[in-house]
Amino acid sequence: MSKYLFVYHAPMTPAEATPPTPEQMEAVMGEWNAWAGKVGDGMIDFGTPLAGGVRVTRDGVSPSTREVVGYSLIEAADFDAALDLARSHPHLNMPGGCEIEVHEAQAIPGM
């Protein structure tokens, strides 16, 4: 089993989006919870919404060029299994062209 970081991208942060009605929020959270149930014991960290990212370099700090709106950390049998979970993720159904990046955690030699 390997660990995978899911990075959620969207054209706007949750705070910038039109607030959902309570019914819409309940439906969306139901989809996310159903997906988490599919991940099962492989869910290491469900994650949280993110906003206000910046890019830090030796030259200074600047606004992030890509909006990261959340993350999850999961464990899956292999990269293909992680991709299958990403393909079925409800984040992809959100309006505005939402995306998920999948990154495999790499072991650090000697640690």
Spans of features found by a protein language model:
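Conserved, structured core segments of small domains
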Residues: 1-111
